[in-house]
Amino acid sequence: MGKVYKGQDWRLDLTSDIDLSSVETTEIQALKPDSTIESYNGEVIDQQNGTVRHDFNPTELDQAGDWIFWIYAKLTNGKEYYGEPYEKHIYNRGE
């Protein structure tokens, strides 16, 4: 995926092992370098393969350091699902 820098646009696609055809809510959640957790709108782009996308804008990638991302999905039957973590280092410009 190459380097991603603080304050840039970035598209993240995450894939889970769950069929998202009966999803009520999808998010990409993130543990940021300062240990806060944020939630971002997730767009389901492949229901059968469980792929969710978020296009980060420059204000969302507001910290350099190690981030951990995962899918959160709430299904129409009320069950909640948390996907496998994906780790990504976000760099300061010039690094």
Feature annotation, model-predicted:
Residues 1-95:
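Contiguous segments within soluble domain cores/interaction surfaces
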